[in-house]
From Swiss-Prot:
GO biological process: translation
UniProt entry keywords in alphabetical sequence: Ribonucleoprotein, Ribosomal protein, RNA-binding, rRNA-binding
Top-level taxon of the source organism: Bacteria
Quaternary structure annotation from Swiss-Prot or TrEMBL: Part of the ribosomal stalk of the 50S ribosomal subunit. The N-terminus interacts with L11 and the large rRNA to form the base of the stalk. The C-terminus forms an elongated spine to which L12 dimers bind in a sequential fashion forming a multimeric L10(L12)X complex.
Family according to the record: Belongs to the universal ribosomal protein uL10 family.
GO molecular function: large ribosomal subunit rRNA binding; structural constituent of ribosome
Role: Forms part of the ribosomal stalk, playing a central role in the interaction of the ribosome with GTP-bound translation factors.
One GO CC term on file: large ribosomal subunit
Gene name for this UniProt entry: rplJ
Keyword Ribosomal protein in record: yes
InterPro entries the UniProt entry points to: Ribosomal_uL10, Ribosomal_uL10-like_sf, Ribosomal_uL10_bac, Ribosomal_uL10_bac_type, Ribosomal_uL10_CS_bac
The protein's name: Large ribosomal subunit protein uL10
Length: 174
């Protein structure tokens, strides 16, 4: 099904809007994937907040022209599926995770703003923790000394109460 000029303009506009919000774009070759597999991949992407779409390469070239993702244009050959996300690691995690279980999906390249990633770069990006994971680790690290201090402060009256209970039990037994 070929698109007419107005439909192409709408697609370019939609993809340009996604690219404007994006922190990462990952492209993968999907040659040989069956519909059921692509449906599972789309569901996973939707749950992770990744915009996943099969597009004509020329339309994507036009959508990324003049943006921080323009270096990716050189990699756009063959049947590709595009993962675009506002989280720098989400698209890489979704596509790399799916590629582990399905060898017909081959990661080709990726891009962060103003930098092109190779296949290995995308896989390395996929192993990084997400922003939420990093924030929770930071918060845990910041709370640990305070929590330990509070437990130490609570231990003094607790020891005193245990001592009183022991004296009471001793007197009750005598």
């Amino acid at each position: 099904m070929s698109l007419n000029r107005q439909e192409k303009a709408v697609v370019i506009e939609e993809v340009s809007a996604q690219v404007a919000k994006a922190q990462s774009i990952v492209i993968a070759e999907y040659r040989g994937l069956d519909v059921a597999s692509v449906t599972v991949l789309r569901k996973t992407a939707r749950e992770s907040g990744v915009y996943l779409r099969v597009l004509k390469n020329t339309l994507v070239r036009r959508a990324v022209a003049g943006t921080a993702f323009e270096p990716l244009s050189e990699q756009l050959t063959g049947p590709l599926i595009y993962g675009i996300s506002a989280d720098p690691v989400a698209a890489a995690k979704v596509l790399a995770g799916f590629a582990k279980s399905n060898d017909k999906l081959v990661i080709k390249a990726g891009s962060l703003p103003n930098s092109l990633l190779t296949q290995d770069g995308v896989k390395a990006l996929a192993t990084m923790p997400s922003r939420e994971e990093l924030l929770s680790k930071l918060l845990g690290t910041m709370q640990a000394p305070i929590a330990q201090f509070v437990r130490t402060l609570n231990e003094v009256p607790t020891k005193f109460a245990r001592g009183l209970a022991a004296v009471r039990d001793q007197k009750a037994a005598a």
